[in-house]
């Protein structure tokens, strides 16, 4: 029930108070929610960038749909999906996973071979569409975490 209450509180903010700043602790929780988001094949095919620097936000404003929001918000969080799956990216994710879990590299070899067979054969547009969907899942969980913390978002 708390989740529904938090989501009911959430809305797309149209203007921010530039004098209010979100704490590092809250930003870290929002990013952690994105990191823990489920993704197809466990690849998490995106990077999350946090922009707090005002001059950098001013540069980003030029391409924004609501430039005032980007200029005045405390932080800009960018979800940058990969352009496509590659053998190197798949290997990097699973090498990291095995290293973090103290397992031998190659333990997931048959699984990663299957992923490569599927993803590398797809056209770039299909890869990117799949990656975008995985990125939106992480974005959704980050927005949910922001709502739980009562941090406004757009």
Outline where the language-model segments fall.
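Acidic, surface-exposed loops and disordered segments
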Residues: 1-154
């Amino acid at each position: 029930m708390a989740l529904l209450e938090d989501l009911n509180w959430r809305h797309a903010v149209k203007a921010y108070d530039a004098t209010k700043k979100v704490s590092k602790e809250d930003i870290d929780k929002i990013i952690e929610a994105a990191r823990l988001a489920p993704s197809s094949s466990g690849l998490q095919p995106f990077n999350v960038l946090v922009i707090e620097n005002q001059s950098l936000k001013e540069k980003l404003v030029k391409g924004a749909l609501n430039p005032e929001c980007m200029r005045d918000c405390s932080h800009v969080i960018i979800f940058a999906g990969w352009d496509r799956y590659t053998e190197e990216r798949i290997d990097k994710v699973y090498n990291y996973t095995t290293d973090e879990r103290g397992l031998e590299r190659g333990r997931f070899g048959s699984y990663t071979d299957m992923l490569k067979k599927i993803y590398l054969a797809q056209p770039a547009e299909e890869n990117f569409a799949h990656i975008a969907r995985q990125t939106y899942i992480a974005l959704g969980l980050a927005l949910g975490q922001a709502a739980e913390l009562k941090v406004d978002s757009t």
